[in-house]
């Protein structure tokens, strides 16, 4: 009798374990997701908003394929950054800090800090413009508000509250998605024209220059530095982590989903402009684009767009400051208070908002500075993920390394072209 009972209990337990196992795996995967969504915010910042709307308004659906190609390259680069962080347990700035001499660390930090300032410039200006559009606030006042609110968000970025920070940023990313896609429900595009835009082609020199600008600005330096940090900050001190293999598998899904979402937002912006703003003038600035959207699609869609822009600014400026803090920590081994890092990058943006007659010009300059910083982030990343002493059994194989180098070389070359064209006044 007792043996029968024991046998029955064992059967029930086994059935319970089998039924619980899929949930456990799914729950474990859900626990890994998050870092890539925070990094993906860099791909839907105000600078990208302006570029995608300008492309659609000028050239219609012609350059849809450029965004798709750009997104594919972004997936590869961001996964490499996550992989480096997962396997080594260190961020890219930390590894650079260990391998460079004192002078090299300082020089590398200086260029990275300039990149962080240029990044924040675009985010804060975009947010100030959104507050001006929504509430009629002066740009300087709007910039101060963006700085203050983003600083509050950064309170949650470390330790046990890091998951809260991730959820806040992901929430803002969803607001961005709705804000920038809403217009498509009012004026849906022609699917045939969208599909036709997937065929790689150009029409004149101007479209080549625009494609170069879009591809060249694909990868944001701070997103590369930060992603290798985020995968480790995702877990609180003392919290058990899955195995490296499980983390890498989860990271692939995390990166794919996050950048599909970010890529869809960028694609929606281009399609919205191609469908509703094609041929209209004045859409080469964020403010002009919003007014055009409001004129064509109505005040409700215009307001929703402005809210999306505000969410874009708040999330991207918070993530940019987070990246700057980690760069300082990794390269200089200084753990400065987050508010201090926030002030360093915020002040230049506020100065521009106070004195500049046309903030859009500052955005262009900032884009050039970002282009200069790309090689400093992407070349070390590709070098270290191919370093067996760092990566061990997870080192990139020869074929993957060749693909990585080809993508990195293309991005760096395009950024060099973008810099030259901008300096010549042609981009």
Regions inferred by a protein language model and the residue ranges of each:
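Flexible loop linkers connecting adjacent transmembrane helices
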Residues: 11-18, 51-56, 79-104, 156-164, ...
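Juxtamembrane transmembrane-helix boundary signature
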Residues: 39, 66-99, 108-114, 153, ...
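Transmembrane helix-loop boundary segments of multi-pass membrane transporters
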Residues: 53-54, 58, 96, 126-140, ...
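Helix-loop-helix module between adjacent transmembrane segments
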Residues: 73-81, 103-123, 131-157, 216-217, ...
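Extracellular/periplasmic helix-exit of transmembrane alpha-helices
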Residues: 74-87, 231-235, 240, 260-288
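Transmembrane alpha-helical segments of multi-pass small-molecule transport proteins
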Residues: 107-113, 134-156, 174-179, 335-351, ...
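Hydrophobic alpha-helical segments and their helix-loop junctions in multi-pass secondary transporters
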Residues: 154, 173-199, 211-228, 381-389, ...
């Amino acid at each position: 009798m007792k043996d029968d009972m024991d046998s029955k209990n064992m059967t029930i337990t086994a059935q319970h374990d089998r039924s619980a196992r899929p949930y456990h795996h799914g729950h474990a995967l859900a626990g890994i997701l998050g870092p890539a969504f925070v990094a993906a915010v860099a791909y839907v910042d105000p600078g990208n908003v302006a570029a995608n709307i300008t492309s659609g308004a000028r050239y219609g659906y012609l350059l849809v394929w450029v965004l798709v190609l750009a997104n594919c390259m972004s997936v590869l680069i961001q996964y490499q950054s996550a992989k480096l962080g997962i396997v080594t347990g260190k961020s890219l700035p930390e590894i650079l800090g260990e391998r460079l001499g004192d002078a090299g660390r300082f020089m590398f930090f200086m260029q990275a800090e300039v990149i962080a300032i240029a990044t924040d410039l675009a985010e804060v200006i975009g947010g100030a413009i959104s507050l001006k559009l929504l509430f009629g606030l002066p740009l300087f006042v709007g910039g101060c508000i963006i700085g203050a609110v983003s600083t509050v968000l950064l309170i949650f970025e470390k330790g046990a509250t890091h998951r809260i920070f991730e959820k806040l940023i992901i929430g803002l990313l969803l607001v961005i998605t709705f804000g920038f896609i809403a217009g498509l429900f009012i004026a849906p595009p022609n699917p045939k024209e969208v599909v036709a835009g997937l065929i790689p082609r150009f029409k004149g020199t101007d479209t080549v220059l625009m494609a170069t600008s879009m591809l060249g600005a694909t990868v944001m330096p701070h997103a590369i530095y930060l992603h290798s940090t985020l995968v480790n900050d995702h877990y609180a001190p003392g919290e058990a982590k899955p195995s490296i293999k499980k983390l890498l598998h989860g990271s692939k899904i995390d990166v794919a989903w996050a950048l599909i979402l970010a890529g869809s937002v960028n694609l929606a912006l281009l399609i919205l402009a191609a469908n509703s703003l094609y041929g209209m003038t004045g859409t080469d600035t964020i403010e002009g684009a919003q007014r055009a959207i409001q004129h064509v699609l109505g005040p409700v869609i215009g307001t929703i767009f402005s809210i999306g822009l505000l969410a874009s600014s708040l999330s991207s400026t918070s993530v940019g400051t987070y990246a700057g803090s980690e760069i300082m920590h990794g390269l200089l081994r200084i753990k400065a208070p987050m508010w201090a890092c926030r002030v360093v990058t915020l002040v230049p943006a506020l100065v521009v908002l106070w004195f500049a007659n046309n903030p859009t010009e500052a955005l262009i300059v900032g884009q050039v500075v970002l282009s200069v910083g790309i090689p400093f982030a992407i070349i070390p990343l590709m070098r270290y993920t191919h370093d067996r002493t760092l990566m061990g059994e997870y080192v990139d194989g020869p074929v993957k390394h060749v693909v990585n180098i080809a993508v990195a070389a293309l991005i760096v070359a395009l950024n060099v072209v973008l810099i030259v064209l901008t300096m010549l006044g042609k981009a």
